[in-house]
Each structure stands twice: as C-alpha cells, then as structure tokens.
C-alpha cells in the first residue's frame, strides 16, 4: 500500500517537472524566436521627404506612406488615453498579451470554428503591423505573441505606445498621429483636444468605414463611444465626456491640392538625387529629407498651363507634344521644366529626350567657336553660295544665295550655306570641342552638325544649358535641379557647389547676344510679342515623308534673367503625324510663357571691359560725283570733289585717281561728302572716282564712274 501511495505521489512530481521544463523551454524559445523574427530596422518609422522651392515654400512631399513621426511627449495625455481606452485598457498592466482578452477571443473563435476575433493588445498590434502580414491564422497569432513579449522586454510602455501611434493607418494615405492631425484638423498633434483625439482613435479599426470625411455619422458614433469608455475607465469625468460628445467633429481638412504642373520637375529632382548624389528614390521616399530646389513655382505653373493650349501646336491633330525648360542665368539652376503637355508622374520626360536641334545649333557649333578662335568677327563676310562638300550640298531654305553675307546677317536670317562654309573653315573638331565644353558631347563627324543634323540629337535641357553659357558671359554651368538636401537631423548631406568653366570670352558672348537680339527683332524669331530684351535662335527640321512638313520645331534663347528652350513635335513623326509649320510657333510659346509669368522688361547690361558691338554699316551706292577746279590763294588751282554721302557717318570713302590708264588709291575720308586736291595741274588729264568702304566687312561698295574735273561748272 505504501508503494502505491509513493507511486501516486511520484506521477504529479514528474508532471510538474516536465511542465516546468517545457515552460522554461517555451520561455527560452519565445526570447530566442522573438529576437530572431524582429528586424529592428523595421522599428525605424519612415518619414516623408519634402521639396521646397527657391522661396522656401513646400511644393511636394515624397513618401511611400504619408507619415510624420513624433515623440510621445508631443502627444497630449488625453489623446493617448483615448487610444488606450478603446484598444487596450490594460496596456500598462500586461506584459505584451492580455490573458482575459485572449481567452475571450479564443472562446469566440471556437464557437465560430475559425479565427475571427483579434483580442490583440497594443503591443501585439504593433508587432503585427510592423513585422507580420494581416492574415488571421493561428501561426501568425503565435508569432505575434512571441514578438509582443519580446518588444515588452526591450522597450518601455511609453516607447511602445509612441511607435504604435506613429505607425497607425488613418485612411486617405495618412500614417501616424501627427500626419493625421495635420490632415483632419490642420494642426499639430500637441494642440489636439480630447474630442479630436477621440475622432482619430475611432478611425484605425476600419479607416474607410470610420472616415470622418466619408462617413462622419459613423465616426461620431464611435467617437462618442470612445469618450464614454474614457469616462468609464477614469480618464475623464462624466461632465467632460458629455461636453465632448456634444461637439461636432470639428474637421479642418488640409486641402490636398493636385499639382500636376510639378510632376515632371519632381521626377527630374529624384533622378538627379540618384545620379549625382547616389541617393536612391526609395531613400528619398522614406528618409524625411528636406530637398531645396531652384524651382520658380509661378514660372513652372505658368509654363504648364500655357503649354496645354492647343493653339500653339500646328500639328495634324491635337496630339502634338511639347517640352520646355528654363534656367536661372546667375546660378544655372533649373527654374521650370515641363516634360510634356499631359505629363504624368514617372512618365516619358521630354525635357531629357533627344531631338534634332536644327539651326539652334549654329551659334553653338559654328559662330561662337569661330569668333572665339579669332578667325571671324560679327561682320566678317562669309560665303553664301550653293556648293558641295563631297557628297553633302547644304541649301538655304529659300534657295537664295547672295555670294557673301556677314556673320550677323547669316545668323539673323538663318542661312544654311554660310554656316556650313564657316564650320568647314574652322574645322568640325573645333566646333565639337566647344559643344562638349557646353555639355553636348556628340559622336557626329560631318559638316551637317552645323545645321543640327545629328545622329541622335540633343535634349531641351542640354540646349538650354548650352545657350545659358552666352547669357552667363561665356561661363558654362551644368543645369541642376537640387540646391541642397538636408536630413532629419538638420545635417546637409548634399550641396550644389559646382563652379562654372570658361568657354567663351565675355566679348564673344556679348557679340553673340547682340546678334541673337537681331534674330528676335528682325530675323526668324519675330513671331509673337515680348517686352524686354530677348536674344535667341530658331530651329526646325524637315520630315521628308511629306512636302513642307516639319518634324522638330525649336526656339532657344535668353533674357537678362532667364535662359530657356522650347521644343514641339510628335513623339513619333509619320505621314499622319507632323507639324504643318515651323519655329514661329515655339517662338511665340516661349515669349508668352515669360510674359504671363511676369518675366518681362529686363535690359541686357554690357560687362565691364567689353566693347559694344556696333550696329552694322549698310552701304548705299554712291552714284553722283562732281569734280571742279577752284581758285585758291596765290592763284593756285584746287580740285574740289563732291558726292552724295551716306546717312551713316561711319562710312569711309575711297578716292581713286586714274592717270594715263593707271588707277591709284589717292586717299580716303570718313563720314564726309567732299574732298579737295590742292595744287592741281590743269593739264594732267587725271580723272577721279569715289568708292564707299565698309570697315566692318572690309569690303567696298558700289561707287561712281570716273569723272574729269571741269574748269567752269555750269
């Protein structure tokens, strides 16, 4: 009998030991598995980054989740209590799991024959939201419990509550209590009332169902329930609860205005962060950065709105596209960039898409280098003839050739033959070297590049950047979209400090500016209206499939403040899709964008120690000449020559004498219509003529015939 009693006593001891052992193993497993499952990086809540323009105004937020993490100390006590009251009233008593709630949930799950009720504590919800999926399975619930227990071991209750409130989803793309406070009440979380806190606490259970915007009645009903629970649990008095329940929801929803005009610019900001500063798009979306950009919001919006107007596009249908970019002359920062008429985020950005630049290339590849190399000047005469260079025969667009024209006129009227002739004179490699210095590196080797005939082309951004060199007195600065990037701690992790490099002299740049002004005043860029100084160049390329069709149309130019380039055409040109007119349309568009943005009335200022480019001397034929003998002192004869002088007193007149069939240059005078030859011989038989001379072109004009002096004029 004693043995039987001993045996009965031994069995419970064995069970107790085994239970203790299994409990120990379970506890160790929870600790080990909990730490194994927890990825502490996930506890670092992502914050949205913001983009601010040149005035410091926020223009966009970048985020995967619209979230603004805050410290627990910034969240009012009664707001915290509203969430505790409804989500986990024993939060400060349990160690990760609430046995009573779990028991109730298990009982209801058994009755339902499956997993239907959560019974989760705030810590468990935090574990689920950060580390686990949202499926309702017993395995997921087990992991949730394990992680929750370990979170309770590693973090204080206040820290857990802080993380919980910062990761909750409040609907409408808003994550975290601070972002929710901004969105629904347009105020800081620290300024929330108990009623407003209850409004927010009502949302997370079913963000769509209890949205105070979509379903205000349902939200108010749940808010009032939460206020009642706060009273029941001793957080507020009955009077406070009744007073709060009597209030309206008090929403002051922050307007989330759609700003599609910023989309193409923002995409270029993200691209530059990746390419230039090795900050990935994902990092920008999650890092809480402040990205300062040189954006001019007014100019950006104006360009977007103007470019949407169909009247600017001479296409075969309404689907012709366009792109524009504008750069600050002082900094080189991009103030506006439009990637398309209906650009969508992450779409085909035509700001960086390459196209054939046409005649906009002439100042960059030909005339700028020609002046800088001191081989030609603005009024140097260039050959304007139909001639072939091997198998390449460039033609003027109007098929008219003048034999010789000045560089200034060749640019003003966009003549092709002189441009190709000049490039041939200075050398293709010379032209390419200047293009490369201006940010355009191309493989093309032929003379066709004088006219923008390239294998691939250039982008509006590249073209604007290159023209900016002239506007910046000959210094090239690579266009940029990011001024600086500041992290959450206020540290500057990226800062634009690029120094420009000298490409053209100030004199060359000023001469080019003056010539390009003539293009706008009387040349190919007269279309449209602009009040203020503007220098620029048109360009277009032909579509050979249809007679008279245009493939690409351009205007690139600059004011004293802004440089820009506008392109228009089709993404794919074919027999049914082409422009029916050329560069006059982007020229007018360019002018209207700046005018409507208020960028008018500015005047170019000549740099110090730079000579002004004189206006061209336009010689008229000298047709009338009189030559008479006159008496002077001591009875000597003087020959007096008189002719019709030019209005331009800079004109020089050469006096030629012909004696015995031999012509000799006797003298020259400037700005006069008369000349005297003293001590004349009445019997010399000499005759005289006058020929005008242009000191700019180094060429003579049309002069008079030879005339013999008369002793007595009638």
Swiss-Prot record:
It holds the Pfam family Transpeptidase. InterPro entries: Beta-lactam/transpept-like (IPR012338), Glyco_trans_51 (IPR001264), Glycosyltr_51/Transpeptidase (IPR050396), Lysozyme-like_dom_sf (IPR023346), PBP_transglycosylase (IPR036950), PCN-bd_Tpept (IPR001460). GO terms for biological process: cell wall organization; peptidoglycan biosynthetic process; proteolysis; regulation of cell shape. Gene3D superfamilies: Biosynthetic peptidoglycan transglycosylase-like (1.10.3810.10), DD-peptidase/beta-lactamase superfamily (3.40.710.10). Residues 34-714 are extracellular. The active site is at 87 (proton donor), 359 (acyl-ester intermediate). Pathway: Cell wall biogenesis; peptidoglycan biosynthesis. It is found in: Cell membrane. Residues 1-12 are cytoplasmic. Keywords: Carboxypeptidase, Cell membrane, Cell shape, Cell wall biogenesis/degradation, Glycosyltransferase, Hydrolase, Membrane, Multifunctional enzyme, Peptidoglycan synthesis, Protease, Signal-anchor, Transferase, Transmembrane, Transmembrane helix. It comes from the Bacteria. Residues 297-592 are annotated as: Transpeptidase. Its EC number is 2.4.99.28, 3.4.16.4. The chain crosses the membrane at residues 13-33. One of its GO terms (molecular function) is peptidoglycan glycosyltransferase activity. It catalyses: [GlcNAc-(1->4)-Mur2Ac(oyl-L-Ala-gamma-D-Glu-L-Lys-D-Ala-D-Ala)](n)-di-trans,octa-cis-undecaprenyl diphosphate + beta-D-GlcNAc-(1->4)-Mur2Ac(oyl-L-Ala-gamma-D-Glu-L-Lys-D-Ala-D-Ala)-di-trans,octa-cis-undecaprenyl diphosphate = [GlcNAc-(1->4)-Mur2Ac(oyl-L-Ala-gamma-D-Glu-L-Lys-D-Ala-D-Ala)](n+1)-di-trans,octa-cis-undecaprenyl diphosphate + di-trans,octa-cis-undecaprenyl diphosphate + H(+); Preferential cleavage: (Ac)2-L-Lys-D-Ala-|-D-Ala. Also transpeptidation of peptidyl-alanyl moieties that are N-acyl substituents of D-alanine. The keyword Protease applies. It is a single-pass membrane protein. Residues 49-217 are annotated as: Transglycosylase. GO terms for cellular component: outer membrane-bounded periplasmic space; plasma membrane. Cell wall formation. May be involved in outgrowth of the germinated spore or it could function in the synthesis of the germ cell wall. In the N-terminal section; belongs to the glycosyltransferase 51 family. This is Penicillin-binding protein 1F. It comes from Bacillus subtilis (strain 168). The lineage of its organism: Bacteria, Bacillati, Bacillota, Bacilli, Bacillales.
């Amino acid at each position: 009998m004693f043995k039987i009693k001993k045996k009965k006593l031994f069995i419970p001891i064995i069970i107790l030991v085994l239970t203790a052992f299994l409990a120990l193993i379970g506890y160790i497993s929870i600790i080990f598995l909990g730490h194994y499952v927890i990825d502490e990086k996930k506890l670092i809540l992502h914050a949205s980054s913001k983009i601010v323009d040149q005035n410091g105004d926020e223009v966009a937020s970048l985020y995967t989740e619209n979230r603004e993490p805050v410290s627990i100390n910034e969240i009012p006590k009664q707001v915290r209590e509203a969430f505790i009251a409804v989500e986990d009233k024993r939060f400060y008593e349990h160690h990760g799991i609430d046995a009573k709630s779990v028991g109730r949930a298990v009982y209801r799950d058994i009755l339902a024959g499956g997993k239907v009720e959560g019974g989760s504590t705030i810590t468990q919800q935090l574990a689920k939201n950060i580390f686990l999926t949202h499926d309702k399975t017993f395995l997921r619930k087990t992991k949730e419990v394990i992680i929750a227990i370990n979170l309770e071991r590693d973090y204080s209750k206040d820290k857990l509550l802080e993380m919980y409130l910062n990761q909750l989803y409040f609907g409408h793309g808003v994550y975290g209590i601070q972002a929710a406070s901004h969105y629904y009440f347009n105020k800081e979380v620290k300024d929330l009332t108990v009623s407003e806190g209850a409004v927010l606490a009502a949302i997370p259970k079913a963000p769509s169902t209890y949205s105070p915007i979509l379903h205000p009645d349902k939200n108010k009903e749940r808010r009032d329930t939460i206020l009642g629970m706060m009273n029941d649990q001793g957080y507020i008095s009955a009077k406070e609860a009744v007073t709060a329940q009597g209030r309206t929801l008090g929403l002051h929803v922050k307007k989330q205005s759609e700003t599609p005009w910023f989309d193409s610019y923002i995409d270029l900001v993200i691209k530059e962060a990746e390419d230039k500063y090795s900050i990935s798009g994902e990092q920008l979306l999650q890092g809480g950065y402040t990205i300062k950009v040189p954006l001019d919001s007014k100019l950006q919006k104006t360009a977007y709105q103007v470019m949407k107007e169909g009247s600017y596009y001479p296409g075969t249908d309404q689907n012709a596209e366009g792109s524009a970019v504008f750069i600050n002359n002082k900094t080189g920062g991009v103030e506006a960039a439009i990637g398309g008429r209906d650009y969508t985020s992450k779409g085909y950005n035509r700001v960086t898409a390459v196209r054939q630049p046409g005649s906009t290339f002439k100042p960059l590849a030909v005339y700028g280098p020609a002046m800088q190399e001191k081989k030609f000047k603005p009024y140097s005469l260039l050959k304007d003839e139909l001639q072939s260079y091997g198998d390449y025969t460039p033609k003027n667009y109007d098929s008219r050739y003048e034999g010789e024209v000045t560089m200034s006129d060749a640019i003003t009227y966009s003549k092709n033959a002189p441009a190709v002739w000049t490039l041939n004179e200075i050398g293709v490699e010379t032209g390419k070297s200047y293009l490369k210095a201006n940010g355009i590196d191309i493989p093309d080797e032929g003379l066709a590049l004088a006219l923008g005939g390239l294998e691939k082309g250039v982008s509006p951004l590249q073209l604007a950047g290159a023209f900016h060199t002239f506007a910046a007195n000959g210094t090239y600065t690579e266009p940029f979209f990011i001024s600086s990037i500041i992290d959450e701690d206020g540290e500057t992790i990226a800062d634009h400090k690029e120094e420009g490099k000298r490409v053209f002299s100030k004199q060359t740049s000023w001469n080019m500016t003056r010539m390009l002004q003539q293009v706008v005043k009387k040349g190919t860029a007269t279309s449209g209206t602009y009040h203020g100084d503007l220098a620029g160049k048109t360009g277009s390329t032909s579509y050979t499939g249809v007679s008279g069709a245009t493939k690409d149309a351009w205007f690139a130019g600059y004011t004293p403040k802004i440089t820009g380039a506008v392109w228009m055409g089709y993404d794919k040109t074919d027999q049914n899709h082409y422009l029916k007119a050329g560069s006059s349309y982007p020229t007018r568009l360019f002018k209207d964008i700046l005018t409507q943005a208020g960028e008018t009335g500015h005047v170019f200022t000549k740099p110090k120690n730079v000579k002004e480019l004189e206006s061209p001397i336009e010689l008229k034929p000298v047709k009338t000449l009189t030559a008479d003998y006159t008496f002077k002192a001591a009875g000597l004869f003087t020959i007096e020559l008189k002719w019709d002088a030019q209005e331009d007193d800079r004109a020089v007149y050469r006096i030629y004498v012909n004696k015995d069939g031999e012509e000799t240059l006797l003298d020259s005078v400037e700005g006069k219509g008369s000349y005297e030859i003293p001590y004349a011989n009445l019997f010399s038989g000499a005759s005289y003529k006058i020929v005008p001379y242009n000191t700019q072109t180094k060429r003579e004009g049309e002069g008079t015939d030879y005339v013999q002096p008369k002793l007595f004029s009638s």
